[in-house]
Amino acid sequence: MSWSPFWLSFQIATLATLLTLVFGVAIALLLQWKKLPARDFIDAVVSTPLVLPPTVLGYYLLVLLGKDSALGDFWEWLFDGRTMVFNFEGAVIAAAVGSLPLVVRSIRVGLEAVDPSLISAARTLGANPTRVLFTVVLPLAFPGILAGCMLGFARSLGDYGATLMVAGARINGTPTGSIYVMDELLAGRDVLPMAAAMTVFGVAMLYFANKLSRRFYHRA
C-alpha cells in the first residue's frame, strides 16, 4: 500500500489550515463587532458550508473558480495559464472553504473569553487598536485559535466530496486519502491501514481541540 495519498492529504490540510487561519481570524474579528451591518446574515453565509451537501459546495466553487469566472481567469493570467480547478490549488481551496466555519466559530469562542477589562486597561495606557489586537487580544485568544486550526485541519484531512468536485479524482496522478479509500474499497482491496491512519490523526486533532475549548468555557 502506498502512503502517497495520506501525504497528499496532509499537504492539502496544512495549506488549507494556514488559509483558514488568516481568513478565520479576520472574519471572527469582524463578526465580534456588534455594530456590523447585516452581522447575522454574514455569519449565516460563513456557516453555509456546514449545511450544504459537499457536492453542492463543490459545484459553487467550480462556478466561482472555473475557466469562465473572473477569479479563474485572473488566476490563469497570474500563473501563465495554470487553472485553479482540477489542480492542487483547487483541492486546498475546497478543503479550506469546507473547514472555515469550524475555524471561525472556535476563534470567536476564544475572542469572547478575552476579559474586556484587559483591553480597556491597555487602551488607558495609550496602546493603539493595532497594538491592543496583537499584544492583548490575539495572545489571550490563542488557545481558541489553535483549537480552531486543529478542527479545521481534521476536517480538511478527510474532505471528500468538495475536493473530488473541484480538484478531480487525481492530483498529478495521486488521489487524496479519502478518495483513495473509496477507490480501493470499490476495487475490493484492503483499506484498513489508510482508514485507521486517517482516523487516528483526526481523532487526535479533535481530542486536543476539545481540551482547549473546555478551557474557554471554564474561563468565560
Question: Language model features by range: what are they?
Answer:
Residues 1-4, 163-211:
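Interhelical loop and adjacent transmembrane-helix boundary motif
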Residues 2-33, 44, 96, 149:
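Transmembrane alpha-helix signature in integral membrane proteins
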Residues 6, 31, 48, 121-123, ...:
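Short hydrophobic faces within alpha-helices
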Residues 14, 18-26, 52, 200-211:
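Generic alpha-helical transmembrane segments of integral inner-membrane proteins
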Residues 27-61, 119, 143:
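Cytoplasmic-entry segments and transmembrane alpha-helices of multi-pass inner-membrane transporters
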